[in-house]
């Protein structure tokens, strides 16, 4: 179980994820069931790509936003080849093409407590994973979100190891 807390309303839960390896596994109704490891993901923030690269999961990216702000050569080649779809502006996502893409999950950076774009994405019925690392007050706090991403790919140990290396180098 992963719980993301609302950075704009301390103590309030933003979303809860129940990670399962079997689609038929029952989970509580107060959160979202996500079958892991993810096989495809769309992300609306270039910052998520660095984490995915460190985890060896760039090949799971099927959609991005604002590819003109992305400098990862693997992702840019995918956009050029058409294997990765650019869904436009992260603040005004192309919902129709998101539905056509149908990734297993959408990783998004919520931009405020009542994010209209997130509300529109939720209406698609696709699992929305809120990665709000940009709200962390410290660089290590931001880096620690690799553990969040790693969990969705069943790579918690690798994510912990990567974070430990980052923390050691930083300190």
Segments predicted by a language model, with ranges:
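A short, structured surface patch at a secondary-structure boundary
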Residues: 6-99, 105-111
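Extracytoplasmic substrate-binding proteins
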Residues: 83, 96, 100-109, 113-171
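Aromatic-residue detector
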Residues: 1, 15-20, 32, 145, ...
């Amino acid at each position: 179980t992963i719980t993301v807390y609302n950075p704009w309303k301390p103590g309030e839960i933003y979303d809860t994820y129940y990670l399962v390896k079997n689609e038929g596994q029952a989970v509580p109704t107060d959160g979202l069931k996500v079958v892991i490891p993810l096989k495809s993901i769309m992300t609306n923030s270039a910052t998520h790509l660095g984490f995915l690269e460190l985890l060896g999961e760039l090949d799971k990216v099927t959609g991005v936003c604002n590819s003109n702000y992305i400098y990862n050569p693997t992702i840019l080649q995918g956009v050029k080849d058409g294997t990765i779809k650019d869904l436009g502006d992260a603040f005004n996502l192309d919902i129709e093409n998101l539905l056509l893409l149908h990734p297993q999950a959408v990783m998004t950076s919520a931009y405020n407590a009542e994010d209209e774009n997130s509300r529109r994405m939720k209406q698609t019925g696709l699992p929305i994973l809120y990665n709000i690392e940009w709200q962390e007050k410290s660089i290590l706090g931001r880096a620690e979100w690799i553990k969040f991403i790693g969990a969705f790919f069943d790579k918690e140990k690798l994510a912990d190891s990567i974070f430990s290396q980052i923390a050691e180098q930083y300190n």
